[in-house]
Amino acid sequence: LYGCRGIYLPLQTDAWGISTPEACGWAVWIGAAPWIARHLWDHWRYSGDREYLKEAYPFFAGVAEFYEDYLVRDQTGTYQILPSQSPENFIPGLGEFPVLLGKSSAMDVQLCYDALGYAIGAAEALEVDADRAALWKTLREHLPPFVIGSDGRLLEWDRELPEGEPGHRHLSHLYGLYPSD
């Protein structure tokens, strides 16, 4: 999907096994695979089971491979996530329709950062794929930084924008604090 290699998991599936994005916005969220990778990584981290890590490594590598193709390098050398979405939130658009997709939402960047880190850590622990791990490190080092707003808070999007729903119940942009490390 999206013309990318690697592993992408949709947000949803239905009773018929259809898992393609059916709506703009929440259905095109790309964060499910890195979120699942977090659970696999936690299992490895707390168990230390190398056999488990060998089985989980293809998943970590597959998620990282998806980002190899999905990230877009901009004129400054930063790898942007385009399109990007912040779950169930929006940016007030021009006219009557909200904008559901943007560039490098905080949550997408944080999930990508973690997923690349899991792939790097697993490759190093298993002493495999040094070249791929080097690429993943480069991508990770050139992701966009967190953006702090004029009022001192971590912003949900790549720049200060009007909020579609101030006080929205999802604090997706805080993923980097929890459950991430």
Cite the ranges covered by each PLM segment:
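Active-site core of glycosidic bond-cleaving carbohydrate-active enzymes
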Residues: 1, 18, 24-46, 50, ...
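Carboxylate/His-rich catalytic cores and anion/metal-binding grooves
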Residues: 1-8
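A residue-level signal for beta-strand positions that form part of recognition/binding surfaces
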Residues: 6, 78, 176
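Acidic/His metal-coordination segments adjacent to aromatic residues that form catalytic metal sites
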Residues: 9-28, 84-104, 160
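Short, small-residue-rich loop/turn micro-motifs
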Residues: 13, 34, 38-40, 83-85
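Acidic/histidine-rich catalytic neighborhood
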Residues: 62-122
